[in-house]
């Protein structure tokens, strides 16, 4: 596919590689556009960056690269959406300049040490893209559905088997739920979406889930389908079905999405820029210094009313100080563009623009890259 935008040529290759090249001469600095509050983009360094990794941030990366080439004409970034694991491996092997990943570097497998060896300095995990996960459903005659953590967990592990179960009905007063059997649909492929959804079930269910979390669905019930395309296609043809999808996909396919009742209050919360923004703003950081690893358990049991709790955070994994200074300069400029002008209209790409408070934390780390 090819997209035409003013001043830039954009192409998304079949292999999943995103390349954007701007027209025009070089520039030393560009101020952030509307919607970016993190300061100027200081252009420079090598002309072409290479990155790979998370498919969940592929759409956001299109917006980030567009912002980069607009801010720094003549500079490019090539992003290969080949999956988080592959992206981290390529970064550790010094095949790319930074990685996109659904999870931070894993100390239990020695990844931070390997990254420090590759970089000649500590690597930093910078949470840059946040995407809500929607609980989607197809129940004939039902257009509004409220769920909470314990009830959702019991649905996805098979403890609750019909839609008019008293535990579901108690959350949906005024809605006549049918006795239709519940058909759970899950991702049959390994998926960061499955991992994060099950972390929500584990963290928000008061022990009702009991299955742990991994990239493989652990619920033990239901029918599997590959990818968002597979699960949504099966959902749309199966009355009584329920699954989980990335928000952008649920919106694009016009799927019904449940509202979530959280630990912060009795009012059900829908996915909006505001509700997910509250979650991001309240995120707790457990990394040290500029290594901004998040404690995502703070998402699942929010304390602020109106926070949507099921959110996938994805990271850009960068060197704090690159062996080649020209690479460090370019990576810093790209990240400045991503968290500045790249935030404008990001919700149109299925991700949530960074709240100003979190944007400021991220900017301090980004500006320290060298």
From Swiss-Prot:
Keywords: Cell membrane, Lipoprotein, Membrane, Palmitate, Phosphate transport, Secreted, Signal, Transport. A lipid is attached at residue 23 (N-palmitoyl cysteine). One of its GO terms (cellular component) is extracellular region. Coiled coil: none annotated. It is found in: Cell membrane; Secreted. One of its GO terms (molecular function) is phosphate ion binding. The keyword Chaperone does not apply. Induction: By phosphate starvation (at protein level). GO terms for biological process: phosphate ion transmembrane transport. It is a lipid-anchor. Phosphate binds at residues 54-56, 84, 102, 191-193. Residues 1-22 form the signal peptide. A lipid is attached at residue 23 (S-diacylglycerol cysteine). The complex is composed of two ATP-binding proteins (PstB), two transmembrane proteins (PstC and PstA) and a solute-binding protein (PstS). Functions in inorganic phosphate uptake, a phosphate-binding protein, although probably not the main uptake protein under phosphate starvation. Part of the ABC transporter complex PstSACB involved in phosphate import. Belongs to the PstS family. This is Phosphate-binding protein PstS2. It comes from Mycobacterium bovis (strain BCG / Pasteur 1173P2). The gene is pstS2.
């Amino acid at each position: 596919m090819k997209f035409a935008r003013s001043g830039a040529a954009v192409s998304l290759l079949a292999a999943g590689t995103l390349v954007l090249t701007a027209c025009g001469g070089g520039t030393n600095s560009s101020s952030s556009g509307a919607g970016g509050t993190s300061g100027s983009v200081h252009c420079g360094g090598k002309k072409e960056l290479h990155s790979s990794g998370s498919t969940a941030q592929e759409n956001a990366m299109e917006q980030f690269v567009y912002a980069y080439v607009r801010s720094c004409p003549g500079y490019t970034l090539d992003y290969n959406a080949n999956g988080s694991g592959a992206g981290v491996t390529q970064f550790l092997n010094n095949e790319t300049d930074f990685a996109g990943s659904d999870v931070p570097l894993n100390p239990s497998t020695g990844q931070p040490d390997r990254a420090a060896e590759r970089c000649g300095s500590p690597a930093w995990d910078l949470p840059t893209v946040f995407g809500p996960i929607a609980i989607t459903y197809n129940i004939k005659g039902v257009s509004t559905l409220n769920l909470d953590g314990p009830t959702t967990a019991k649905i996805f592990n098979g403890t609750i088997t019909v839609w008019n179960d008293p535990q579901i009905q108690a959350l949906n007063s005024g809605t006549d739920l049918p006795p239709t059997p519940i058909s759970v649909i899950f991702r049959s492929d390994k998926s960061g979406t499955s991992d994060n959804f099950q972390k929500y079930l584990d963290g928000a269910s008061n022990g009702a889930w009991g299955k742990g979390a991994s990239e493989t669905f652990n619920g033990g019930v239901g029918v599997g389908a590959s990818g968002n395309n597979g699960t949504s296609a099966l959902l749309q043809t199966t009355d009584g079905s329920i699954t989980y999808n990335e928000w952008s996909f649920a919106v694009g396919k016009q799927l019904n999405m449940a509202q979530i009742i959280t630990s912060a209050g009795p009012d059900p919360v829908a996915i909006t820029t505001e509700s997910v923004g509250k979650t991001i703003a309240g995120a707790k950081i457990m990394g040290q210094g500029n290594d901004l690893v998040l404690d995502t358990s703070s998402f699942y049991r929010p304390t602020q009313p109106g926070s949507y709790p099921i959110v996938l955070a994805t990271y850009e994994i960068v060197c704090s100080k690159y062996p080649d200074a020209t690479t460090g300069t370019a990576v810093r400029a790209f990240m400045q563009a991503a968290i500045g002008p790249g935030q404008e209209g990001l919700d149109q790409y299925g991700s949530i623009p960074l709240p100003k408070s979190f944007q400021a934390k991220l900017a301090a780390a980004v500006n320290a890259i060298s």
